[in-house]
Swiss-Prot record:
Protein encoded by which gene: atpF2
Protein name: ATP synthase subunit b 2
Alphabetized UniProt keyword annotations: ATP synthesis, Cell inner membrane, Cell membrane, CF(0), Hydrogen ion transport, Ion transport, Membrane, Transmembrane, Transmembrane helix, Transport
Lineage, broadest ranks: Bacteria, Pseudomonadati, Pseudomonadota, Alphaproteobacteria, Hyphomicrobiales
Species per Swiss-Prot/TrEMBL record: Rhodopseudomonas palustris (strain BisB5)
Superkingdom to which the source organism belongs: Bacteria
Subcellular localization: Cell inner membrane
């Protein structure tokens, strides 16, 4: 075996030489209690003074500064919210005005277009009425001319038929009155 390891004889001898007892842990020694309490009191007083005079004011200042910053930010946010609400109201009012103007412009344009369309329709109707009247005059003149030609042709045809069938020359007045009676109806 290795030296120092597992040597039970050496361990027993060492314990037996000390008598089996060692000195107590220093904080538990009765002789040093008073000096330890004084040292502990001085340390806690020093720690209290450092914390209360240096650290707490700094931390308090930081907390106070942070609180002021938060309050300032909240006030600025409230102000900006009010401004944005006002801007939104102004935008909505402008939008409503724009809508009403657009509707008015649309109505005005619609009225103008309707009036223009009505005027154009009336002009077109007048032109068509004039064209129809001209066409009726032309038709009437053409009919009169055609009827005049038909009378002449009918009179000649009737005279030719009578001469062919009867072998006589018919009277022109009698022939014209018979053709006129036949044409009238």
């Amino acid at each position: 075996m290795a030296e120092g390891h597992g040597d039970a004889k050496g361990a027993t001898a060492h314990t037996a030489a000390d008598g089996g007892h060692k000195a107590p842990f220093p904080p538990f020694q009765k002789e040093t209690f008073a000096s330890q309490l004084v040292s502990l009191t001085i340390a806690f007083v020093a720690l209290y003074l450092i914390v209360s005079k240096i650290i707490l004011p700094r931390v308090g200042g930081v907390i106070e500064e942070r609180q002021k910053t938060i309050e300032g930010d909240l006030a600025a946010a409230q102000k900006l919210k009010g401004e944005s609400d006002d801007a939104l109201k102004a935008y909505e009012a402008e939008l409503a005005q724009a809508r009403s103007r657009a509707q008015a412009i649309g109505a005005e344009t619609r009225e103008k277009l309707n009036a223009a369309a009505e005027a154009e329709r009336k002009t077109l109707e007048q032109r068509l009425a004039a064209k129809i009247a001209d066409a009726e005059k032309t038709i009437s003149a053409t009919r009169t001319a055609a009827m005049g030609n038909v009378r002449g042709i009918a009179s000649e045809a009737a005279a030719a038929i009578v001469q062919q069938l009867a072998g006589i020359q018919p009277d022109s007045k009698a022939l014209d009155s018979a053709v006129n009676a036949s044409i009238k109806g």
